[in-house]
């Protein structure tokens, strides 16, 4: 595709969390190579090139679908993440891993094989494995780096003090240092602001943030009296699935719905959707900073939804009253907001 200049304030990364073979991941909405190609067409039409995938996405099938869609031939840059699933209730998400050295090596090699590439630009440790000394993990990661299997290291879902520990260990041992931190962050989940963000700024670590729409909660699709039978099987808040229960635990409560009602009312006054309120806040009114190398991840369930998100991210700052309502809304849910780390 030809070179197109993005119109967004921040680099936008396409999250591949909804890509997968339906037989392997109940929540997959982008299930064929043709579906993936259509999603990538929409993404690249806005000038964006980075895609974020993980070993657990689609139980490994997200990577293979991206490979089949010829991500390299399209000029994309795909990053991959390794989640330590083995000691968690995540057996349904494919091959199990820890962050023990042998598993880190096996995990990265599995990433490369699935993506059909000899090297990753960015390899991310998706969460801590606190049963493995972090020094052991980082030592093996550095060996993999020195072997030329990836160019940059990222970390995600670690506590702020763990970030300090990791950065200092890497400095002390002359190991490859993390180049960015990936986190959950949105207008109604700002748990990273008091401690993690200052930590990242102190180490000049860019912040890449996901779940800008609260896992889809900040859309027109949901209401508090919505019966379970109305949820599409496998959808983000389907109470019958693992990931549905996970999102419901985080967002599906009266405090969040009270705030959602207020956002909708104020949005109508300015002809703004929930999506526009959430994404324009993140782009213009949050603690993200372009000069710090920060970026925003979006995860479209289909090309039309992705297009809506990308257009919202190209829009200007919100009216002052809307920002005030969003800030007041967060103050009301702050007491029930979960941690930013795993």
Curated annotation (Swiss-Prot):
What organism does the UniProt record list as the source? Monascus ruber
S-S bonds? none
Tell me the superkingdom of the source: Eukaryota
The keyword Isomerase is assigned to this record: no
* Lineage of source species: Eukaryota, Fungi, Dikarya, Ascomycota, Pezizomycotina
For the ligand (NADP(+)), the binding residues are: 52, 182, 236
- Annotated active site residues, numbered on this chain, are 57 (proton donor)
The protein's name is Aldo-keto reductase pigE
Provide the family line. Belongs to the aldo/keto reductase family. Aldo/keto reductase 2 subfamily.
Tell me which UniProt keywords the record has, alphabetically: Glycoprotein, NADP, Oxidoreductase, Pigment, Signal
